[in-house]
């Protein structure tokens, strides 16, 4: 646990540094693309550099996997923790001053769903906030940066059985009829649309408000979804399931049933309260 605490404390330091960089950084694009074909923002690259430099200082870190790196970066061959991360989720929204964040998954020895032992995310908005799921079976912990520059524990996060928020992503013209019917049912039941375009912000709102659904389905142009399994989807699945919520890819009972074949693999994904995920399964099983 001491080594994990070193990682958690490093994530806190990273969050504080990136939060400051965001305020004044150049928001322009580079001339490079990341491993999944997105043109990199200078802020993406800078955030990745900050995270890499911080984790290189820890002897317990075996390797790093980043959205902005083509391949796994080995740090200490004999260490046991692999950190997979999205350095700045929603970075294209910084220029309109929306909240964005960083996502971290901590794997032990090998990158497999069952080897994900902890996860965290930071959110850079009007306030700097952090959520850490320290271990399987424990409620995620919510922190907020205080006036003294240190993170203060606020509360543990637990989702209700049923929520009222509906954060629905992907281009609607590419939705399947099954997904369209499901989303229409949520709106017919009175769910409120809450979608910013930043995964961290939308999932954070559902967690803090107690429940609802975040969806990024398969579409006609992206049948395997767009969100990355290793450093976006599984870390949030770990957090949501430990907050007594549920997750799925629309086929499996949980996102942890996904088989990882490559580090930049994508998947359709759904996160939410148990009632919403149960309803989704009913619709998807009818197709």
UniProtKB/Swiss-Prot annotation:
Keyword Amino-acid biosynthesis attached: no
InterPro entries: FBPase_C_dom, FBPase_class-1, FBPase_N, FBPtase, SBPase
Classification via Pfam families: FBPase (PF00316), FBPase_C (PF18913)
GO cellular component, one term: cytosol
Taxonomic superkingdom: Bacteria
Keyword Disulfide bond on entry: no
Gene3D superfamilies attached to this UniProt entry: 3.40.190.80, Fructose-1,6-Bisphosphatase, subunit A, domain 1
Catalytic reaction list: beta-D-fructose 1,6-bisphosphate + H2O = beta-D-fructose 6-phosphate + phosphate
Binding site for Mg(2+) 2: 86, 89, 232
Broad class of enzyme this protein falls into: hydrolase
An individual GO BP term: gluconeogenesis
Cofactor note: Binds 2 magnesium ions per subunit.
Keywords: Carbohydrate metabolism, Cytoplasm, Hydrolase, Magnesium, Metal-binding
Pathway: Carbohydrate biosynthesis; gluconeogenesis
Gene Ontology molecular function terms on file: fructose 1,6-bisphosphate 1-phosphatase activity; magnesium ion binding
Enzyme Commission number(s) from the entry: 3.1.3.11
Binding site for substrate: 89-92, 195, 226
Subcellular location(s) of the protein: Cytoplasm
Binding-site list for Mg(2+) 1: 67, 86, 88
Major location (coarse): cytoplasm
Names of the cofactor(s): Mg(2+)
UniProt family annotation: Belongs to the FBPase class 1 family.
Subunit comment: Homotetramer.
Name the record gives this protein: Fructose-1,6-bisphosphatase class 1
Organism per entry: Campylobacter concisus (strain 13826)
Gene name of this polypeptide: fbp
């Amino acid at each position: 646990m001491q080594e994990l605490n070193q990682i958690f404390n490093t994530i806190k330091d990273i969050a504080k540094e990136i939060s400051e960089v965001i305020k004044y950084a150049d928001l322009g694009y580079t001339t490079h693309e990341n491993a999944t074909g997105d043109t990199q923002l200078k802020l993406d690259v800078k955030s990745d550099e900050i995270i890499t430099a911080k984790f290189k200082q820890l002897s317990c870190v075996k390797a790093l996997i980043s959205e902005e790196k083509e391949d796994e970066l080995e740090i200490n061959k004999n260490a046991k923790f692999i950190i997979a991360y999205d350095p700045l989720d929603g970075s294209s929204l910084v220029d309109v001053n929306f909240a964005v964040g960083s996502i971290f998954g901590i794997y032990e020895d090998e990158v497999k769903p069952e080897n994900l032992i902890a996860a965290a995310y930071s959110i850079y908005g009007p306030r700097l906030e952090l959520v850490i799921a320290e271990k399987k079976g424990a409620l995620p912990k919510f922190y907020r940066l205080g006036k003294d520059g240190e993170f203060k524990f606020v509360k543990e996060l637990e989702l209700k059985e049923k929520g009222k928020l509906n954060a629905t992503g992907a281009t609607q013209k590419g939705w399947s009829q099954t997904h369209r019917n499901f989303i229409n049912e949520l709106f017919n039941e009175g769910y409120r649309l809450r979608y910013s375009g930043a995964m961290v912000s939308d999932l954070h709102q559902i967690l803090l408000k107690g429940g609802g659904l975040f969806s990024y389905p398969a579409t006609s142009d992206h049948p395997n979804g767009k969100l990355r399994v290793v450093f976006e989807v599984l870390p949030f699945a770990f957090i949501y399931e430990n907050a007594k919520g549920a997750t799925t890819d629309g086929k499996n009972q949980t996102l942890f049933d996904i088989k990882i074949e490559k580090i930049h693999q994508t998947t359709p994904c759904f996160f939410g309260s148990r009632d919403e995920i149960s309803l989704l399964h009913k619709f998807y099983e009818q197709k």
